[in-house]
């Protein structure tokens, strides 16, 4: 590419919704390494982290927090970096252009911009706008704190973390999201994990990493190339481990010799169905301990017991269930207590 061609375009790496948290802690170093390798091989003009770098609002877990800070530090040493404050980065979902988030100390670093207000950025004579999460219905209001509509129309791309009208969130189609005129600039947004174009000028690259076992969303990061009258994007699959769910009975699991193996490319969660006493017994076995050592996530699903229901019905009271609850509480087993509560909630 000639120097003239480089001057007439801007390339951006957009990283959507990483959601660093305790549950994906072991995968974060691999995630970071893959992104840094891509940046080293494919230089860009700047990087945008599209919000929700952390997951738990105002509750901070030390390990994911340290990994997030290190990730930003690694990015900014390579390229100018903009980090949008997502709703999960704020203390709650009602924040409107506030500094009530965990990233304020990072504002003192060079070559990184923490976007908790509307930010304008010019690169190769092209203008970009970056907007943090704001509650649905207030996106245009937020932009107008810095730009008039005439100025907005001169912008090439608006980067956001927002729910827009018509976007799909699983089986739900947004009816409360912000409406964005089709003759306004292109928006590239985080917040919605499903990759999609709800309209011609709104692009959701989707979340960069799978966040839950069984989630079917395709996870990529996007390298964007913006020219005067063109927009191109390359969706890059990081090939992170696939998180899958397998269902079976406690009896099946207790036999051992599962045909599922955790690898660098695939991890499993086992959902075991059975009765409370089966779960309690299984948790004391060598098979259960081995599953945990091999990295399996294990959860239990109580199989309704007709005997318990008939006793409760015949007595015409909750005496039996009261006794059951008391016995479970005396075990001091938090998982067993959780299972008992789930069982009682079934009626």
From Swiss-Prot:
InterPro entries: Calcineurin-like_PHP_ApaH, DNA_Repair-Maintenance_Comp, Metallo-depent_PP-like. Its EC number is 3.1.-.-. GO terms for molecular function: hydrolase activity; metal ion binding. Belongs to the metallophosphoesterase superfamily. IIV-6 244L family. Transmembrane segments: none annotated. Disulfide bonds: none annotated. This is Putative phosphoesterase 078R. A divalent metal cation 1 binds at residues 52, 211. The keyword Heme does not apply. It comes from the Viruses. Keywords: Hydrolase, Metal-binding. A divalent metal cation 2 binds at residues 52, 87. It is an enzyme of class 3 (hydrolase). Pfam families: Metallophos.
């Amino acid at each position: 590419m000639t120097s003239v061609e480089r001057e007439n375009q801007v390339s951006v790496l957009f990283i959507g919704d990483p959601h660093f948290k305790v549950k994906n802690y072991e995968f974060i170093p691999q995630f970071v390494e893959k992104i840094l390798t891509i940046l080293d091989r494919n230089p860009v003009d700047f990087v945008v982290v599209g919000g929700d770098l952390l997951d738990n609002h105002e509750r901070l877990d030390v390990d994911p927090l340290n990994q997030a800070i290190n990730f930003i530090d690694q990015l900014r040493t390579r390229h100018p970096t903009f980090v949008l404050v997502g709703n999960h980065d704020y203390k709650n979902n009602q924040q409107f252009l506030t500094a009530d988030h965990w990233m304020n100390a990072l504002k003192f670093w060079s070559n990184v911009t923490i976007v908790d207000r509307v930010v304008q950025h010019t690169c190769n004579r092209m203008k970009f706008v970056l907007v943090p999460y704001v509650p649905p219905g207030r996106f245009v209001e937020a932009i107008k704190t810095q730009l008039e509509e005439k100025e907005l129309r001169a912008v090439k791309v608006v980067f956001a973390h927002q729910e827009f009208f018509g976007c799909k969130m699983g089986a739900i189609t947004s009816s409360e999201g912000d409406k964005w005129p089709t003759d306004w600039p292109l928006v590239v947004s985080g917040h919605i994990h499903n990759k999609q174009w709800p309209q011609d000028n709104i692009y959701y690259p989707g979340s960069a990493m799978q966040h839950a076992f069984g989630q079917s969303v395709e996870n990529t990061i996007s390298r964007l190339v913006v020219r005067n009258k063109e927009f191109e994007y390359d969706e890059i699959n990081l090939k992170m481990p696939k998180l899958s769910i397998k269902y079976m009975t406690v009896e099946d699991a207790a036999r051992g010799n599962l045909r599922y193996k955790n690898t660098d490319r695939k991890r499993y969660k086992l959902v075991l169905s059975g009765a409370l006493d089966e779960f309690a017994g299984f948790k004391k076995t060598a098979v259960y301990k081995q599953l945990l050592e091999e990295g399996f996530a294990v959860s239990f699903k109580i199989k309704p017991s007709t005997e318990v229901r008939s006793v409760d019905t015949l007595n015409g009271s909750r005496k039996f269930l009261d006794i059951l609850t008391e016995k479970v509480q005396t075990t001091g087993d938090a998982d067993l207590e959780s299972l008992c509560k789930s069982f009682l909630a079934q009626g």
